[in-house]
């Protein structure tokens, strides 16, 4: 692709981020970082990089699970079968990401909308399941510690059902 085609793709990405009201940085031309707001996962850190032939997107979803990694990874792989444009991946530390690429020729305002929407939806919808599968012991300890001290359990409410069942 030419410099003009890469610049055009970067312009479309920039306009899409602005259109969605997202605060973003552009540390280098064609490299964007933004935080996508969610409900279950309050923010998803996301980067978009205009490359030689494609637009790459990568979003941090969760750190390396403390336990039950095989079940977490199996769930992610099964989930990948239903995802659009991105897939779950793990880095060398075991941290979980959504990662994808589209050809520069496919970079349009509608496709940027779909891409950002996919990342936001998949990160948000998957977050609690990843936590339940990969961090259950830590969540249970935190829950019990807060209850014993009369502390708020507000940010653990999504897990109340299985936390209140016997261990």
Enumerate the predicted regions with their spans.
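Conserved short hydrophobic interaction patches
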Residues: 16, 20, 75, 79-83, ...
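A contiguous, mid-protein "functional segment" used to position or interact
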Residues: 105-145
């Amino acid at each position: 692709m030419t410099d003009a085609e890469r610049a055009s793709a970067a312009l479309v990405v920039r306009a899409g981020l602005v259109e969605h009201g997202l605060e973003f940085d552009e540390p280098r031309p064609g490299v964007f970082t933004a935080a996508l707001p969610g409900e279950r996962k309050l923010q998803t850190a996301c980067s978009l990089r205009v490359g030689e032939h494609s637009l790459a997107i990568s979003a941090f979803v969760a750190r390396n699970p403390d336990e039950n990694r095989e079940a977490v990874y199996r769930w992610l792989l099964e989930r990948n079968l239903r995802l659009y444009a991105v897939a779950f991946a793990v880095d060398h530390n075991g941290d979980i990401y959504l990662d994808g690429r589209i050809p520069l020729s496919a970079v349009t305002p509608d496709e940027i909308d779909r891409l950002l929407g996919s990342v936001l939806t998949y990160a948000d919808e998957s977050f609690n399941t990843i936590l339940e599968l990969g961090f259950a012991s830590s969540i249970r300890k935190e829950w019990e510690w807060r209850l014993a001290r009369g502390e708020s359990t507000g940010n653990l409410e999504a897990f109340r059902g299985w936390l209140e069942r016997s261990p």
